[in-house]
Amino acid sequence: MPIKRMWGGRFEEAGDQLVNQFNASISFDQEMAQEDIEGSLAHVKMLKETQILSAEDADKIIAGLKKLRERLTSEGLPFSIDNEDIHMNIEALLTEEIGPVAGKLHTGRSRNDQVATDLHLYVKKRLPIIINELKKLQAELVDKAAENVETIMPGYTHMQHAQPISYGHYLMAYFQMFQRDVERFEFNQQHTDLSPLGAAALAGTTFPIDRQLSAKYLGFAGPYHNSLDAVSDRDFALEFLSNASILMMHLSRLCEELIYWCSYEFGYLELADSYSTGSSIMPQKKNPDMAELIRGKVGRVYGDLFSLLTTMKGLPLAYNKDMQEDKEGLFDAVKTILPSIKIMTGMIATLQVKKEAMEHATHHDFSNATELADYLATKGIPFREAHEIVGELVLKGLKTGTNLVDIPLDEYKKISPKIEEDVYTCLQPKVAVERRNSYGGTGFDQVRQQIKDAKKILEGK
């Protein structure tokens, strides 16, 4: 049932219906119902411990909150727009459950620190879930890389064939991207792991509360050191959205290549049927819709970030109603990135790699040109001169339809008498890849080492 507005004493007129609807946030902040109850439980336990509330009153409130928590889990709670937000809805339901003593719950607390606490708890809970899902994706990338250490494919710059690489090496590049995402979310935990509870409206409270105790009850590392900062800070949410945006950018880049490489023109990969869809008119189609959807959802997460950045940019201290707009984008980002990570994990796990098609693409594309330039440099020809020579040979090959491996040895000897039969060996794509064993390179030994190191990271060593 609706309760009398908690702030209504100063007002003579009832609110306009449209204004009340515009002001209400229960349609979306009910997402934090669990967190709101948890925050209230911690607060009332602290009030009991500090003897601000009697044990009898506190125990009634605690029992009532626990009943609401059980109902929320089992059947849900009946929220009303008349009660404006999740905090007032929970208090209204608590009042129905235990009577007027519920009004004592708000002693030494404001909705300003209450909502900030709820939001901290919401993000704090979800960060380890996201990190865990990212690690599952990384594990699939490592497994797929281990299967494809010696799978040769074209490496690209400017979407043009550049040099042959190991497909395993390519996959490990994404492992590293997602590792940075993991580290960013882990760092995000530090700024999220602070309790605003007890900061009250902005200046603290005259009640002898114990903020360290309520922070401990909620599992926070400690309370904010400044009450103004506690109620006005949304940096932790901005960090989360920034991290989510970078993560989605990484997923989008991977999706872009999956989409290309599953096409008829490339034919390097094939997605499992379970991660593809068909066409209502074209019977032959197998569309990479999941990859396209992930790529498309990047924009909404970017929008969530820029929405909150724009909301916060001009706000004076401390709390402003603008900050009600901090939640929907945050909730949306969480609900977007988690399924995106899970679906990408499944796509990688079930991905069919067409090794022959990949390697075939490296045999007539001149991606071995750098190998020839390096080879000539080892024979004493300055690299810049070698680069010019090979460029001319490539141009000639393009005009005649021949490749560098088709040039007779006597033609090579005209360039330098030091060139031997082994020039043809170095021009083989697999040899070219295998020889690039500088640290972090695409050489097979280096890729195996990257995989070994990655497994240690995933094992926490």
UniProtKB/Swiss-Prot annotation:
It catalyses: 2-(N(omega)-L-arginino)succinate = fumarate + L-arginine. It is found in: Cytoplasm. PROSITE patterns: FUMARATE_LYASES. GO terms for cellular component: cytosol. The keyword Secreted does not apply. Keywords: Amino-acid biosynthesis, Arginine biosynthesis, Cytoplasm, Lyase. It holds the Pfam family Lyase_1. The keyword Amino-acid biosynthesis applies. One of its GO terms (biological process) is L-arginine biosynthetic process. Its main location: cytoplasm. GO terms for molecular function: argininosuccinate lyase activity. Pathway: Amino-acid biosynthesis; L-arginine biosynthesis; L-arginine from L-ornithine and carbamoyl phosphate: step 3/3. SUPFAM superfamilies: L-aspartase-like (SSF48557). It comes from the Bacteria. InterPro entries: Arg_succ_lyase_C, Argininosuccinate_lyase, Fumarase/histidase_N, Fumarate_lyase_CS, Fumarate_lyase_fam, Fumarate_lyase_N, L-Aspartase-like. Its EC number is 4.3.2.1. Belongs to the lyase 1 family. Argininosuccinate lyase subfamily. This is Argininosuccinate lyase. It comes from Limosilactobacillus reuteri (strain DSM 20016).
